[in-house]
Amino acid sequence: MKRLLVLVLAVIMMASATLSAAPARIEPELSVITPVASFVSVAALDAFKVWAKEKYGVDVKTNYTAKGTQLAVGLIREWGANPQADIVWGGETVLYDMLAADGFLIKHEVPKQLLDRIPDTMGTPKPMPLKDPKGFWVGTALEPYGIVYNEGLVTRRLRATPPKTWEDMLANPKFKGQIAQCTPDNSSSNHATYEVILQKYGWEKGWEWLSKLAAYTGQFVARSVDVPGVVAKGEYALGFAVPSYMAFENFLNGADIRFIAPPGAYVTPEPIAIIKNCKNPNAAKAFIEFLLTDEGQRLFIERGLFPVVPELRVEGPPGSTAELAVTFYGGRRSYFEGTVENTYDNALSQSRESEVNKYFRENIFAKLDALKAKY
């Protein structure tokens, strides 16, 4: 009898150990709200489904809602205690800090071996966070906000030199009427670039520069994602843009466009966070884990984004999408090779978001005709 009891206890202990060693069960569904382009987000979700099946034995049904960052944040606030998505992904970290402070996100633990590969910050003289020290969000990939330009239009038709700095946009009168941009109150990415200028030059000189930029602007498009399209078609020579918001896709489709991130350009770590009271928190955690694996990071590399892990870089066989991305970016392969200038202050940007938008509407957008006459 004792021998039988010992045998039963041993079997129970072995079963318990097996269960504890097995991966935690995840929900069979995952919903994401994101400004990240479908070129990236759909591929990531499809790859995650394969990864989740192999690791957890679960067929995860995924869906995503494509929204600009500001619209996504607004929806999350509207949803309140009944969110219609599990994850918010992409955009500017300052908006994630605001959501966290207002109680719309939950802290989550990323596997230590993956989290430790990501540096706390990047850039000088103002270090830019790549992961939230409080644990509400973590960066997934690096993407600069900068200038997209039509190389043929700039060099052959206008006989101008492609821009390398912010100053170059306004230094050549040939660019007057050749710039496209979205207003900062309609685009969080454009708002971030406005803040880069304001923090670089100071409030008064920054607005003077932005006023001249408005005078040189041929069109204020409805969305930031529209800028690469009008530049690719040759309707305008250059404009503020985010690579994954159609710029790199247009390049892959044969458009004669290139991208430059001027010194001090904002670089988003494409943050990701779990929404409080979401329906599928374990699937959400698993998706974040997947994006930080080598497999997830390579997915970004193959779509023109930079890895958030220093030991990885954008490279691939000749003619690969990764190598085409290097051409598109003017030779850059990593944001961890060499010095990255950053003066963008998250706290300052957060504290005056409404003030910046109000100033733009009242002193620039409402006075466009006068500014065009002045400059």
Language-model features: where?
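Short, low-complexity disordered leader/linker segments with a strong preference
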Residues: 1-29
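Early extracytoplasmic/lumenal segment of secretory-pathway proteins
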Residues: 24-98, 228
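Short beta-strand->loop
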Residues: 33-36, 131-142, 149-151, 156-158, ...
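A structural signal for short loop-to-beta-strand junctions that line the ligand-binding cleft
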Residues: 83-88, 106-151, 178
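A bilobed periplasmic-binding-protein/Venus flytrap-type ligand-binding module shared by bacterial periplasmic
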Residues: 148-153, 268-282, 299-300
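Periplasmic-binding protein-like
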Residues: 179-182, 290-311
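Ligand-binding pocket segment of bilobal, Venus flytrap-like solute-binding proteins
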Residues: 196-261
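Conserved C-terminal helix/tail region of periplasmic/extracytoplasmic solute-binding proteins
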Residues: 336-375
